[in-house]
């Protein structure tokens, strides 16, 4: 889970530490969206993310997607909320909280041809 990669300098979650026979997730249903996670992370973590991903952070969800797809992991999985650059209010599940979970729905028109093209391009670029 890529969101876990930036807590320490030698994290096994960093892409360069991932073996081929694993799965790289930007986040899961039990994590915040990549945008939400980044927005709430301490500044020193955000700085590490920006340096690692060589980004200014303005498209952080797509930076997470690109980093997952570019990892050595055999499989890369990203939540649809990351494709849509959605924040914490679109989180799927908060473990230990009984109400309000699993209510996320994709509204008509959100998955545009521009997003499909961007996903297709990054998928081809990294041989996914």
PLM regions and their residue ranges:
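Catalytic cores of glycan-processing enzymes that make or break glycosidic bonds
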Residues: 1-128
């Amino acid at each position: 889970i890529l969101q876990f990669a930036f807590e320490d300098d030698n994290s096994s979650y960093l892409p360069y530490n991932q073996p081929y026979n694993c799965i790289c997730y930007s986040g899961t249903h039990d994590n915040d969206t990549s945008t939400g996670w980044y927005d709430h992370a301490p500044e020193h973590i955000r700085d590490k993310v920006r340096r690692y991903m060589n980004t200014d952070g303005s498209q952080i969800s797509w930076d997470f997607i690109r980093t997952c797809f570019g990892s050595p992991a055999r499989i890369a999985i990203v939540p649809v909320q990351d494709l849509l650059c959605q924040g914490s209010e679109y989180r799927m599940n908060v473990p230990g909280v009984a109400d309000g979970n699993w209510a996320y729905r994709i509204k008509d028109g959100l998955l545009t041809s521009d997003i499909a093209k961007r996903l297709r391009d990054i998928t081809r670029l990294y041989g996914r």
